[in-house]
Amino acid sequence: MAAVCDICGKGPGFGKSVSHSHRRTSRRWDPNIQTVHAVTRPGGNKKRLNVCTSCIKAGKITRG
């Protein structure tokens, strides 16, 4: 599953993990993506969307 929000387009962030001895290895931080059933428009069809939790908390979708 792609780690991209269907509403805001938030995707993974990239960076380095740094150990105690300062060795650096690449890593990525994925957003908290949840699959939800949402109504596309009032009285419309339900659709399955991949949405980040910040969009769910902000009320950017109507769950159905």
Curated annotation (Swiss-Prot):
Keywords: Ribonucleoprotein, Ribosomal protein. One of its GO terms (cellular component) is ribosome. InterPro entries: Bacterial_rp_bL28, Ribosomal_bL28, Ribosomal_bL28/bL31-like_sf, Ribosomal_bL28_bact-type, Ribosomal_bL28_sf. GO terms for biological process: translation. The keyword Kinase does not apply. One of its GO terms (molecular function) is structural constituent of ribosome. Gene3D superfamilies: Ribosomal protein L28/L24. The keyword Ribonucleoprotein applies. It comes from the Bacteria. Belongs to the bacterial ribosomal protein bL28 family. HAMAP family: Ribosomal_bL28. PANTHER family: 50S RIBOSOMAL PROTEIN L28, LARGE RIBOSOMAL SUBUNIT PROTEIN BL28A. This is Large ribosomal subunit protein bL28C. It comes from Mycobacterium tuberculosis (strain ATCC 25618 / H37Rv).
